[in-house]
Amino acid sequence: MQVAKSDLYINRKEIVMKYTKKTNTWLDEFERNRPLVIAGPCSAETEEQVLKIAHELKNSDVSIYRAGIWKPRTRPGGFEGVGEIGLKWLQKAKAETGLLMAIEVANVTHVKLALEHDIDVLWIGARTTVNPFAVQEIADALRGTKKIILLKNPVNPDLSLWLGGLERLQNAGIEKIGIVHRGFSTYEKTKYRNIPEWQIAIEMQNRFPDLPIIIDPSHITGNRNMIQEVAQEALDLNYDGMMIETHIDPDNAWSDAAQQVTPSALKQILKDLVVRNSDDNTDEYSKSMAKLRANIDALDSTLLDLLGKRMKIAGQIGQVKKDKNVAILQNNRWNEILEKMVKDGDRKGLSEEFVLKLFKAIHQESIEHQEKVFNK
């Protein structure tokens, strides 16, 4: 899947929103020496189920209890949530356990009902983030709220949509904002339900280092056996917390059964996660890192030089094709290159997924260089 360069590399001067330390003060409200944990069922199914899960999570590292009240299903006919009655179950769960409550809101009616039932955390889902009209209506309905508002990444890998959603929330005077990385839809066959596209989330971190970022390994993996792996990757990238779907009987859950874990499994996952230091100020560490980073910088510069030379040759090839009236795209040649590079990459310890992404990007740039020649 090709991602437009404009989606990933928006000029920083175009970003008008400025986040201050106020953005992450809501994290400081939680007394914790480990990442923030949001957990609970994909869907609130029955009052008994909601309360039982909440009580099993009460004495754990979980601070916020999540449950889907309205479910935006891809196709009609599936379970679409219990609706407003579920909010009363969450009120009862909060009263009995002291956990904060979190739900997804997809429209103004959802927001109104959530606020009426004093839900603590509201998140905007991936299918809503893709629609600027919907996000604006929700932002207007939440204007000036003191609730914690989380924005999931859009379904498609479009950085500008994610940024636009943040801008709309910030412009509505909402200060307690965070983002949730839940992966991106793809037609490609991968081990993930939604591919992480870590570089997009990393770019968000680079632009807004004080903005809390939460990983959602349940939706990224779609597989309970991969949740710890992805959660650990996120912690290694300095994420602030995680949202993990948890159910007392995952295999019989009414929605997304394969990606939910039991409360006991969740506790084991959290126990096994390793929280890294964000930095090390010792002289030995600084000297070692300075040397290694200098090597990386030199190699990166060499890479760019080589790519520049490659594109010049691609332009020359384009001229030959133009002179001989030959089409730019030569599928047989392209497939031969991919096959060879995947094999060479494997011998060098590079994954097939990485090699394919790299050379597809290089190929796209080569085509653009040749198109410029054709259009002269």
Model regions and ranges:
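Catalytic beta/alpha-barrel core
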Residues: 82, 99-107, 111, 120-135, ...
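Hydrophobic faces of well-ordered beta-strands that scaffold small-molecule active sites
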Residues: 36-41, 63-67, 101-103, 122-124, ...
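Catalytic alpha/beta core domains of metabolic enzymes, predominantly
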Residues: 30, 134-265, 272, 278-284
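N-terminal small/glycine-rich loop or linker at the start of catalytic domains
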Residues: 24-42, 73-76, 205-215
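Glycine-rich, proline-tolerant flexible connector loops at the mouths of alpha/beta enzymes
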Residues: 66-85, 248-257, 317-328
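Active-site mouth loops of central-metabolism enzymes
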Residues: 35-52, 76-78, 100-104, 125-126, ...
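N-terminal amphipathic alpha-helix/helix-capping segment at the start of soluble metabolic enzymes
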Residues: 4-38
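Domain-level signature for soluble enzymes in the chorismate/prephenate branch of the shikimate pathway
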Residues: 278-376
